[in-house]
Amino acid sequence: MALTAITLLCFAALLPFPGLALPADSGKLEQVPVKVTVINDFTNEVLSYSTTVIEEGLMFGALNQLQDTSNDFKFSYTIHKTFGIYLESVNGLAGSDKDQTYWELLSEKAGVITRLEVGIGCYQPQRDENMILRFTTWAKK
């Protein structure tokens, strides 16, 4: 329930009023380096990328920046009316209800990996953070 409320608030703040997603002095903010790691649990493929995001910016912005600057990275998303921006596919691979697969969002900071509690439209990566996009299943193994 709390996750739904947080996501709804982020969605409401971002879409109608794009300026609310950034601080008032965002013109003075610098670009900070971040990493994006794409992991496919089924093929054991791991791809690593470097990009930047505006300080206090969003994961969505970092992924767009990476897509704009790398021929090897593509992502797609949908906008859910209740839950906001939803990561749909990475490099042409999409989650599937039939196959019980999805893209799990993780963060690695100082060697500690945690699951994100918000989506790409709300999460604010920090300098030198590794954002992990993990293609996995919710089915019991």
Feature locations, PLM:
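Ubiquitin-like/PB1-type beta-grasp interaction modules and other compact soluble beta-rich domains
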Residues: 2-141
